[in-house]
From Swiss-Prot:
HAMAP family, per the entry: UPF0291
Location(s) in or outside the cell: Cytoplasm
InterPro entries named among the record's database cross-references: DUF896
The protein's name: UPF0291 protein Bcer98_2342
Amino acid sequence: MLSHELIERINFLARKAKNEGLTEEEQRERQSLREQYLKGFRQNMLNELKGIKIVNEEGKDITPAKLKALKKKNNVKLN
């Protein structure tokens, strides 16, 4: 989950980098926080996609096979 504190710290370091620069330790921290943020974002996006079913105008399921396979692998019900 993407915590408010994580985002606040990333934003603080971004402002500091723009205004006065970062120490090497802060640069490493910023990189680590960015990686954590991206990992959480990707996981949240994947969870959202797992819950999606795509249908055409006639109501026929046209969900891509790759997404169906992912849902099946993770035991997600296709509505």
